[in-house]
A protein has these predicted regions:
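Extended, low-complexity cationic-aromatic segments
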Residues: 6-107
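Short helix-terminating capping/connector loops at secondary-structure junctions
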Residues: 19-20, 113-116, 143-146
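C-terminal anion-handling pockets and recognition modules
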Residues: 20-24, 31, 156-157, 163-228
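Acidic/histidine-rich, metal-coordinating catalytic segments
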Residues: 28, 102, 113-130, 152-161
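Short catalytic/ligand-binding loop motif for oxyanion handling, primarily in non-cytosolic enzymes
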Residues: 33-36, 75-76, 127-131, 157-162, ...
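RNase H-like polynucleotidyl transferase catalytic core
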Residues: 48-57, 140-162, 179
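Short, aromatic/basic amphipathic alpha-helical patches
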Residues: 130-143
């Protein structure tokens, strides 16, 4: 990782540290892959039991999820089934689905927080880059709480995003503990596991809390010589 990227991460951390973590929101997408349970389980007649898949082949069913958090809580996610993706003729979550999530779920959830101003932080996935469309989606639902929408520096999510470091990993482990599942229960399992997540320690791990050294996780401090 270059010294320049470390400086970009540090600059954004300084900006976000000036906000309360309860006013900094992260949004991202993840997925859970399921395969048929390898052992016999108790399910209703005609139902197939599933467990989290270790492979990524076409034989595993993928459930996509859009999720958000602020420093003290997670917000209601949106889960897309393999059938919904097939009907929409898409392989994953696209921009239209993201904007629909804002319209159906997120705008109302944001206003329910009753906090202003909020800052929304995203990685540089292609579906996130049209910031004007995102702002308009919130505006169309009379949601005015989000003042800023920021894109993280390239390849910075593992160091800056609580979702990538490492809420999504912990969430998948919670889902694994609740398997086996069926097609009727997997969305509830995914949602219930997500609502139990606690973002606060992950914000600290990402250097987003006040007075945290913005270079604390620099991979090469003696080479980069930050601040010298």
């Amino acid at each position: 990782m270059s010294a320049d990227l470390c400086e970009q991460i540090a600059d954004m951390r300084r900006k976000l540290q000036r906000c309360r973590t309860t006013h900094v929101m992260f949004l991202d997408e993840t997925a859970l892959r399921l395969s048929e349970a390898p052992t016999h389980t108790i399910v209703l007649p005609g139902e197939q039991a599933y467990v989290m898949a270790t492979e990524t082949s076409s034989y595993s069913k993928r459930y996509d999820m859009i999720a958000c958090c602020v420093g003290d809580r997670v917000l209601l996610p949106k889960i897309f089934t393999p059938t919904e993706r097939k009907d929409a003729d898409v392989k994953g979550i696209n921009r239209a689905m993201l904007l629909q999530f804002v319209d159906d779920v997120l705008a109302q959830a944001v206003e329910g927080l009753d906090r202003y101003p909020l800052t929304l932080v995203l990685d540089r996935a292609s579906i996130h880059k049209n910031l004007d469309a995102l702002r308009q989606a919130f505006h169309d639902r009379s949601s005015e709480s989000i003042k800023d929408i920021l894109l993280m520096p390239p390849n910075a999510a593992k160091r800056m995003s609580p979702l990538d470091n490492a809420m999504f990993h912990d969430w998948k482990e919670k889902c694994r503990l609740l398997c086996p599942a069926t097609a009727k229960t997997i969305q509830r399992i995914m949602s219930d596991a997500w609502t139990k997540m606690k973002p606060k320690p992950h914000y600290k791990h990402c250097g987003l809390t006040h007075n945290t050294d913005v270079y604390f996780d620099c991979p090469a401090p003696t080479v980069h010589q930050h601040g010298n």
